[in-house]
Swiss-Prot record:
Primary location: plastid
InterPro entries, sorted: Isoprenoid_synthase_dom_sf, Terpene_synth_N, Terpene_synth_N_sf, Terpene_synthase-like, Terpene_synthase_metal-bd, Terpenoid_cyclase/PrenylTrfase
Disordered: annotated segments: 33-56
Entry binding sites for Mg(2+) 2: 556, 560
Organism: Isodon rubescens (Rabdosia rubescens)
Similarity-based family: Belongs to the terpene synthase family.
Name the UniProt record assigns to this protein: Ent-atiserene synthase KSL4, chloroplastic
Length: 806
């Protein structure tokens, strides 16, 4: 029958039993005693009362993060500022147009003679990987000052730094900025023409020049649109060979070339284009005497804050600020703002964030950006950009988005090549890429992803184009601190809930049942809830989910493995009658315990829901359970009678018998919004349930085909093969069933994200959470194998995050 709890349990129960404990309860029993002894770390969570409010430090950190939305700060680029400093006055070629930029260079040289920025120096224990960027910035600054006869002492110190650190120019362990192998040698040639005396290691210099020649040869022979744009982007490194007139076709409405101050400055030096000059004036008017590596970058900067908050699990504290950013981004998207549609990272991030937050954005603009990326300046050489585009391309909602699916495959291949080739120099980024490839967004539990994101959070994070740059949300210690505090706070609550769950299990005598040998079952049932909707205020919903999940597991065992037909019918009759004397009406000890526990659980959940909803919903929960029991009984009868249903008959029953109804539907009443009787009778409610359940059912049928075929049971796989005359192979059938599942999953996500909806968004989210659960455990061909699951559960429930680990 395959239900979500069994997905978690049955694959390798012996291994699970040997690896997991459950907490001791006040009532000692053989079951609870055996659950207590394991290798999991023992933790004592703080008392619940202490978890109800945040510390002053927590609130202060929130306040500082909220201010990020108002600043739009970016780090200054020495490299780009130096190129702006080289720009001559439009009125006199002998005078600098932007003398303040030159004064900034004079004021910002480092004691070692370089023009490094703070982010060039590692804040972790690992050495900096940005030395090539520092070399470029330093040499560009020297050239700018020398051009106008300024800072002879600064120039001498800078030249000395270059001589001492020149070996980094060919160090393959260093991160190479885009175009470095062309631009840096070109600047060295220019320095030689100016008789700047650089005593450089000849071996390293020859190696560097050979790299330049090979890169230029490759670009010349390639002749593709990608290469043409790439060469335009690094135009300042092409010198007199460059046809600047042809480059101007890439000029944007704001006058820039690629929103790059350095490229735009070089273009003005060559052509005296007034729009280029106006762009540079605009940048300096905004930032003062120095410029960033990319301008404008406001939309991307704001979206990065939103994305970091969401991925770190703390977005719920900034809902007002986030809503404002999303509304403004959507307005810019509809207007075709160049800051979005002309920048791959911004477009990918905007598309993903807007679509996942319910804004109606078509994939057309995004697809064009992805296609253009292969003819854009090095975007596919930037792993961060490729990863962002890949994440966005996963969000396929409509049947006609075939091109989006193609681009998703293409981007996935690129990331796989980067991963297998070992070319990702940042260990954090490498882990992030691996996580994205291993677990699609629809097959990753929220808490698992949040923990990984926190662990991969890089306090030295920066982006690399021609030069490196940072944003306020990159490596922000406040974001890291708040996310760790919140994660550990929620985790402590989850551990306390698990203790309560343990008591409930024993108090309901479920440990006495023979199939309770699967002691770890309830551990996993709770984990699925805590790992998907984690907020402290959702405690009642988590407990309802977990308890009903465990009950469905045990009922499924009765119908699928251990029970007699008499016991099955007796249990159904007891639920239908409800008010019965269990001492006389139950046909077995097993049924008595099951029914008593089920009744108590339904009443308990119903009472909690009554308090929130202001009306009784107990009868609805009973109906949900009866629907499941009748569907399970029908499958037993089909197998007994060797009845072959039509596919429609099978689907009609099988989506109910997959047993997600009692887990998800009662919990909807406990997440906050009011659910009226009209809502739960609406077609949208039933569509959400069916789509979610069919995803699980189809994946289960693929995985369980051989076993159920051997047991004489039918499922979607066997019916599909039969309906095709038995002439297709199981491998072909698997591909078809997987395509059905893909359609159901996309339809479900589209319905969940639909803004104009009958069912409240908080309730719809639970359907998607469960869909993610079942996809996770069927994500890999061999299933989410038990040892891996053990490790994930251990991390999510038991291992707090320690800040000193980062």
């Amino acid at each position: 029958m395959g239900i979500v709890a069994l997905i978690l349990i049955k694959a390798a129960m012996s291994l699970i039993l040997s690896s997991f404990p459950l907490f001791r309860s006040s009532r000692s029993s053989p079951a609870s005693a055996s659950l207590a002894g394991s290798g999991l770390p023992k933790t004592t969570p703080p008392k619940t009362a202490s978890l109800q409010s945040h510390s002053p430090m927590f609130e202060e950190t929130k306040g500082r993060i909220a201010k990020l939305f108002k600043k739009n700060e970016v780090c200054i680029s020495t490299y780009d500022t130096a190129w702006v400093g080289m720009v001559p006055s439009p009125f006199s070629s002998d005078q600098p147009c932007f003398p303040d930029s030159l004064f900034w260079l004079l004021d910002n040289q480092c004691p070692d003679g370089s023009w490094a920025q703070p982010h060039h120096h590692s804040h972790s224990h690992s050495p900096s990987l940005l030395n090539k960027d520092v070399l470029s910035s330093t040499l560009a600054s020297i050239l700018a000052l020398h051009k106008w006869g300024l800072g002879q002492h600064h120039i001498a110190k800078g030249l000395h730094f270059l001589e001492l650190n020149f070996a980094s120019a060919t160090d393959n362990s260093q991160i190479t900025p885009l175009g470095f192998d062309i631009v840096f040698p070109a600047m060295l040639d220019h320095a030689a023409d100016l008789s700047l005396n650089l005593r450089l290691d000849p071996t390293t210099l020859n190696d560097l020049m050979n790299r330049r020649d090979l890169e230029l040869q490759r670009c010349t022979e390639n002749g593709s649109a990608e290469t043409e744009v790439y060469m335009a982007y690094i135009g300042e490194g092409m010198g007199k060979l460059h046809d600047w007139e042809s480059v101007m076709k890439y000029q944007r409405k704001n006058g820039s070339l690629f929103n790059s101050p350095s490229t735009t400055a070089a273009a003005f030096i060559a052509l005296r284009n007034s729009d280029c000059l106006n762009y540079l004036y605009s940048a300096l008017n905004k930032f003062g005497s120095a410029v960033p590596a990319v301008y404008p970058l406001d939309i991307y900067s704001q979206l990065c804050i939103v994305d970091n908050l969401e991925r770190l699990g703390i977005s719920r504290f900034f809902s007002t600020e986030i809503q404002s950013v999303l509304d403004e981004t959507y307005r810019c998207w509809l207007q075709g703002d160049e800051e979005i549609i002309m920048d791959a990272s911004t477009c990918g991030l905007a598309f993903r964030t807007l679509r996942m937050n319910g804004y109606k954005v078509t994939s057309d603009s995004f697809i064009k950006v992805v296609q253009d990326c292969f003819s854009s300046p090095g975007h596919m050489r930037d792993v961060n950009t490729t990863l962002e585009l890949y994440r966005a391309s996963e969000l396929m909602l409509y049947p006609h988005e075939i091109e989006l699916e193609k681009q998703n495959s293409r981007l996935r291949s690129l990331l796989e090549q980067e991963l297998s080739g070992g070319s990702i120099q940042s260990s954090q980024l490498n882990a992030e890429v691996k996580q994205a490839l291993d677990y699609p967004f629809y097959a990753a539990l929220d808490r698992m992803v949040k923990k990984k994101t926190i662990e991969h959070y890089n306090i030295d994070d920066s982006r690399i184009l021609k030069t490196s740059f940072r944003l306020p949300s990159f490596g922000n210690k406040d974001l890291l601190s708040l996310s760790v505090q919140d994660y550990n706070r929620c985790q402590a609550i989850h551990r306390e809930e698990l203790r309560e769950f343990d008591r409930w299990f024993v108090e309901n005598r479920l440990d006495e049942l023979e199939f309770a040998r699967h002691k770890s079952a309830y551990y996993y049932c709770y984990f699925a809830a805590a790992a998907t909707f984690f907020a402290p205020e959702l405690s009642d919903a988590r407990m309802s989910w977990a308890k009903n999940a465990l009950m469905t597991t045990m009922v499924d065992d009765l119908f699928d493995v251990t029970g007699s037909v008499e016991e099955m019918k007796n249990l159904i009759q007891l639920v239908e009658l409800w008010d019965v004397d269990v001492s006389t009406e139950c046909c077995s000890h097993k049924v008595q315990i099951l029914f008593s526990a089920l009744k108590r659980t339904i009443c308990e959940v119903g009472d909690r829901a009554h308090q929130l909803q202001g009306r009784s919903i107990r009868s609805h929960i009973i109906v949900i359970w009866l629907d499941l029991l009748h569907s399970m009984m029908k499958e037993v009868e089909w197998t007994r009678d060797k009845f072959v249903p039509t596919m429609d008959e099978y689907v009609s029953n099988a989506h109910v018998s997959f047993a997600l109804g009692p887990i998800v539907l009662p919990a909807l009443y406990l997440v906050g919004p009011k659910l009226s009787e009209e809502m739960v009778n609406h077609s949208e409610y039933h569509n959400l349930f069916k789509l979610m359940s069919m995803c699980g059912r189809l994946m289960n049928d693929i995985r369980g085909y051989e076993r159920e075929h051997d047991d004489g049971k039918l499922n979607a796989m066997s019916l599909y093969i039969m309906n095709n005359g038995g002439e297709i192979t199981p491998e072909v059938a698997i591909l078809e069933i997987k395509s059905w599942n893909d359609r159901h999953r996309r339809d479900l996500l589209r319905l969940v994200l639909e803004e104009k909806s009958v069912i409240p968004k908080a309730c719809k989210d639970l359907f998607w959470h469960m869909c993610s659960v079942v996809h996770l455990f069927y994500n890999k061909d061999d299933g989410f194998w038990s040892q891996e699951l053990i490790e994930v559960v251990n991390q999510v429930i038991h291992q707090p995050i320690l800040l000193n680990h980062f």
